[in-house]
């Protein structure tokens, strides 16, 4: 009975340890992030502007000031608002560098309405440094392109070697030892034939060993420097790729905005051309004389009277004018009195010119003048 209870307790401990473990296998490499995982809590990184990113990984939700239903949250320090960064994890491996970088992408966050509709997300880059076991995550980007990015350099980010790789390494090591022993036997056989040569060769071997040791030390130092440089370059290249991806997305958005602006400018040009045509038409209309109804009636009456005068004038033909002149001359000769004087012509000429008189009227006027 006691054994049964001990078995149940041991099984519960094993299940608890499995639930708290964080092992990731990808592309033939295995990573153990269990020491970095928060069982009761969350990781927090703060930007210089007061923005905060809360996160955890290995599909473990967190209880944060922003909520407890997502794997990561973003707190906007300028507005005081919280946004979910995602609820699902996706893994990828950067194998372009000597030391591989494990990338965890948390997706499915809140929807953001910017130049285009997209969902917020987060990237966590784990870079390997076998000598660092106390580092903390560093915030690289906070929602500039719709995602938050964190880089974490630690020894727990290094891939675990598989048994096949270890066996291969051991086999290579044994083969090297056999080759080394074979070479030593040849040297000993040659040394037995000539002691002087043995001693010189031993000295040469010692010198070579010293040189090899110095070279090994230099190589170790160079390897350490290269490892540090590779670690830095790995993180930098990863961030550069992220920025290139973001820049590509932004370039597409900017190109779409550029096309929209070009279309809008063409529409504005068409409106401007139409507006200029309307202005020219208005100017032409303003240059034409404008009359109201009274002015039009007055102008029309004046034109009618002028046409009537022209009609009356045209009805007097040349024969009538010649007859009037002959009558005038005949009457003028009769106006001479006994003293040989002539009646003032001004009294007769205006009547002929201003009035349409007949010869009988002229004779009547002449007789009236003589009576006075």
From Swiss-Prot:
Residues 20-160 form the MRH domain. Its main location: secreted. SUPFAM superfamilies: Mannose 6-phosphate receptor domain (SSF50911). This is Putative uncharacterized protein DDB_G0278881. The keyword Chaperone does not apply. Residues 206-230 have a biased composition (Low complexity). Residues 1-19 form the signal peptide. InterPro entries: Man6P_isomerase_rcpt-bd_dom_sf, MRH_dom. GO terms for cellular component: extracellular region. Disulfide bonds join 22-58, 128-158. The lineage of its organism: Eukaryota, Amoebozoa, Evosea, Eumycetozoa, Dictyostelia. Glycans are attached at residues 18, 59. Residues 201-233 are annotated as: Disordered. Residues 185-282 form a coiled coil. It is found in: Secreted.
């Amino acid at each position: 009975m006691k054994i049964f209870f001990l078995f149940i307790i041991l099984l519960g401990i094993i299940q608890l340890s499995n639930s708290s473990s964080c092992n990731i296998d990808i592309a033939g490499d295995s990573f153990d992030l269990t020491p970095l995982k928060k069982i009761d809590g969350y990781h927090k990184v703060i930007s210089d502007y007061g923005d905060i990113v809360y996160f955890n990984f290995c599909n473990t939700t967190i209880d944060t000031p922003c909520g407890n239903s997502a794997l990561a949250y973003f707190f906007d320090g300028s507005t005081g608002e919280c946004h979910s960064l995602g609820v699902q994890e996706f893994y990828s491996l950067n194998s372009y560098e000597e030391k591989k970088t494990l990338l965890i992408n948390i997706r499915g966050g809140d929807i953001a309405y910017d130049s285009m509709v997209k969902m917020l997300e987060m990237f966590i880059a784990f870079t390997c440094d076998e000598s660092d076991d106390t580092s903390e995550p560093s915030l690289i980007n906070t929602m500039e392109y719709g995602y938050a990015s964190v880089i974490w350099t630690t020894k727990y980010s290094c891939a675990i070697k598989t048994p096949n790789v270890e066996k291969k390494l051991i086999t290579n090591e044994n083969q090297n030892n056999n080759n080394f022993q074979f070479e030593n036997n040849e040297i000993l056989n040659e040394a037995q034939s000539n002691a002087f040569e043995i001693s010189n060769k031993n000295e040469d071997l010692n010198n070579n060993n010293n040189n090899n040791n110095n070279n090994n030390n230099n190589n170790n130092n160079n390897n350490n420097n290269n490892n540090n440089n590779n670690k830095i370059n790995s993180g930098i290249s990863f961030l550069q790729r992220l920025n290139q991806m973001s820049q590509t997305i932004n370039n597409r958005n900017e190109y779409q905005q550029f096309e929209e602006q070009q279309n809008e400018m063409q529409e504005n040009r068409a409106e401007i051309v139409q507006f200029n045509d309307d202005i020219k038409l208005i100017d032409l209309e303003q240059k034409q004389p404008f009359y109201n109804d009274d002015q039009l009636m007055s102008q029309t009456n004046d034109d009618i009277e002028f046409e009537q005068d022209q009609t009356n004038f045209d009805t007097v033909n040349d024969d009538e004018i010649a007859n009037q002149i002959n009558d005038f001359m005949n009457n003028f000769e009769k106006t001479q009195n006994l003293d040989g004087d002539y009646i003032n012509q001004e009294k007769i000429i205006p009547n002929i010119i201003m009035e349409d008189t007949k010869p009988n009227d002229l004779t009547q006027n002449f007789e009236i003048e003589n009576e006075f």
